[in-house]
Amino acid sequence: MGNKQTIFTEEQLDNYQDCTFFNKKDILKLHSRFYELAPNLVPMDYRKSPIVHVPMSLIIQMPELRENPFKERIVAAFSEDGEGNLTFNDFVDMFSVLCESAPRELKANYAFKIYDFNTDNFICKEDLELTLARLTKSELDEEEVVLVCDKVIEEADLDGDGKLGFADFEDMIAKAPDFLSTFHIRI
């Protein structure tokens, strides 16, 4: 008549704890959140490691993401299937990277992926324009957008190639004191 959870094996829970910044209680809470997204799709028993993909369209409706202008980009950055659908492992990874205790370097890596719209491993002027459009809801005129993008590249482009590589981006993030406090969501 115990109160023992039967969603995961102890080994699975230990593995999640080893690979994330979460404890057992957090993992079970994440499963509950994942289950709530698609109760007809997500099983209550993960002991046999089922592979279930919850569609991006459901994930971006979560309160933590719903109003975020980068919600699709965030989910896509953690999706292993390339379509933006998340398995439970992907879902846990997303919350782990975006939790308060994740290190700056890990967060910077995923932030870079989110802002690299054309996936060329650089943040170019076009990526910055798309970022600005989302952040300002396209309220800046074309001249203002060009000015801001040029200024960002001028200040952050350490090697002078006209675009931001990961090292440039990481250096820029290191100078942004609010990056860690804004690049997170709570479970």
Swiss-Prot record:
Q: What else is known?
A: The binding of either calcium or magnesium significantly increases the structural stability of the protein in comparison to apo-CIB (calcium- and magnesium-free form).
Q: Which residues bind Ca(2+) 1?
A: 116, 118, 120, 127
Cysteines paired by S-S bonds = none
What interactions and quaternary structure are annotated? Monomer. Homodimer. Interacts with WHRN and MYO7A. Interacts with ITGA2B (via C-terminus cytoplasmic tail region); the interactions are stabilized/increased in a calcium and magnesium-dependent manner. Interacts with ITGA7 (via C-terminus cytoplasmic tail region); the interactions are stabilized/increased in a calcium and magnesium-dependent manner. Interacts with TMC1. Interacts with TMC2.
**Protein's UniProt name:** Calcium and integrin-binding family member 2
Q: In which tissues is it expressed?
A: Widely expressed.
Note the SUPFAM superfamilies from the entry.
EF-hand (SSF47473)
Record-level GO BP terms:
calcium ion homeostasis; cellular response to ATP; photoreceptor cell maintenance; positive regulation of cytosolic calcium ion concentration
Q: What does this protein do?
A: Calcium- and integrin-binding protein that plays a role in intracellular calcium homeostasis. Acts as an auxiliary subunit of the sensory mechanoelectrical transduction (MET) channel in hair cells. Essential for mechanoelectrical transduction (MET) currents in auditory hair cells and thereby required for hearing. Regulates the function of hair cell mechanotransduction by controlling the distribution of transmembrane channel-like proteins TMC1 and TMC2, and by regulating the function of the MET channels in hair cells.
Cellular location(s): Cytoplasm; Cell projection, Stereocilium; Photoreceptor inner segment; Cell projection, Cilium, Photoreceptor outer segment
Q: One GO MF term, please?
A: integrin binding
The observed outcome of changing residue 186 to W is: In DFNB48; inhibits the ability to decrease ATP-induced calcium release; decreases interaction with TMC1 and TMC2; does not affect the localization in the cuticular plate or to the tip of stereocilia; does not affect binding with WHRN
User: Any idea where the EF-hand domain is?
Assistant: 66-101, 103-138, 144-179
In its keyword annotation, does this UniProt entry include Ribonucleoprotein?
Answer: no
From the UniProt record, report the name of the gene that encodes this protein: CIB2
Short name of any one Pfam family annotated for the protein: EF-hand_7
Q: Which UniProt keywords apply?
A: Calcium, Cell membrane, Cell projection, Cilium, Cytoplasm, Deafness, Disease variant, Magnesium, Membrane, Metal-binding, Non-syndromic deafness, Repeat, Retinitis pigmentosa, Usher syndrome
| Major location category of this protein | cytoplasm
Q: Methyltransferase: present as a keyword of the record?
A: no
Q: Which disease is it linked to?
A: Deafness, autosomal recessive, 48: A form of non-syndromic sensorineural hearing loss. Sensorineural deafness results from damage to the neural receptors of the inner ear, the nerve pathways to the brain, or the area of the brain that receives sound information. DFNB48 patients have prelingual onset of severe to profound sensorineural hearing loss affecting all frequencies. Usher syndrome 1J: USH is a genetically heterogeneous condition characterized by the association of retinitis pigmentosa with sensorineural deafness. Age at onset and differences in auditory and vestibular function distinguish Usher syndrome type 1 (USH1), Usher syndrome type 2 (USH2) and Usher syndrome type 3 (USH3). USH1 is characterized by profound congenital sensorineural deafness, absent vestibular function and prepubertal onset of progressive retinitis pigmentosa leading to blindness.
Which positions in this protein are listed as binding Ca(2+) 2? Answer: 157, 159, 161, 163, 168
GO CC terms of this entry: blood microparticle; cell periphery; cuticular plate; cytoplasm; muscle tendon junction; neuromuscular junction; photoreceptor inner segment; photoreceptor outer segment
